[in-house]
């Protein structure tokens, strides 16, 4: 007896272990579901902010090389060109996506890379013209600017050559000037007439240049200015706002689905149950009226159903007469083609509401099995069986 193991203590420890293991599994499952939900909401928030940023922010800067061409069918003995250098620049990406966005102001500049040659120094001022066109080649905007090389004296050129001689010898520096010509300071795209390209022309036949680039830079204001100059701060605020909004929606949906604490359904379900009960009563009344045809010359009666709240049909009177109360039990009327022997209900002086309802105390004695068959046959036919009239039992008023 002394060496017997403590069985109740072991059982208690086993039960406690099972309970703790169940709680641990439940907590682990809840934590996993919560973590997956938070991760999904965070991913959706980042996706929404990225989609908004991509659709709302235009191209910040667009740099396109400018390739000039000119005629060569003139006399080659002269040093000047046969025509002005002209270039056609497309303002679409891949032939489909446009570079410019509607309503956004842009700064359009032309960068010219000119050598400091004696020809360019003697060139003086020259004119640069840009013509923007839309579909079909129709010109919609034109702008012209004058340009010239920056002046430097012979002494300054000599000193510059001496200082940067080592870099010039190894090719790390060149004797050239980069001119930036502002063609449009505030160019706005028209949504009805989009810009598809531009034609650039230099009005000089003696110009010498290394290359040229057309730069289009967006000038942001308002929200776009904040998104461009403070990208990390705006991204954090945008993702946090989306995450908060989605979390509130998910929380309200969870509360409504689990507890139903926001919009309770008790009143709505009660109304639905009452409507269903009324519909079932009407259906039973319709079926009873279908079993009682009214021939010509006979007095039509209004059958009423003995349906209770549980939906029992009048075909089983033994189960309904004891359950119906005086307020819910309908008045019993005689069948069509039968004569009533009760003067109080047929002479018009009284009403069916004045007659007392049947109760368990004054129910008539049940008829034998042999006598119930003619009654059933009478309910299914318009003529009484055997030519006998069924008398309605007189109910004593309480």
Swiss-Prot record:
Glycans are attached at residues 88, 242. Its main location: endoplasmic reticulum. One of its GO terms (biological process) is positive regulation of cold-induced thermogenesis. Disulfide bonds: none annotated. GO terms for molecular function: phospholipid binding. It is linked to Lipodystrophy, congenital generalized, 2: A form of congenital generalized lipodystrophy, a metabolic disorder characterized by a near complete absence of adipose tissue, extreme insulin resistance, hypertriglyceridemia, hepatic steatosis and early onset of diabetes. Inheritance is autosomal recessive. Spastic paraplegia 17, autosomal dominant: A form of spastic paraplegia, a neurodegenerative disorder characterized by a slow, gradual, progressive weakness and spasticity of the lower limbs. Rate of progression and the severity of symptoms are quite variable. Initial symptoms may include difficulty with balance, weakness and stiffness in the legs, muscle spasms, and dragging the toes when walking. In some forms of the disorder, bladder symptoms (such as incontinence) may appear, or the weakness and stiffness may spread to other parts of the body. This is Seipin. The lineage of its organism: Eukaryota, Metazoa, Chordata, Craniata, Vertebrata.
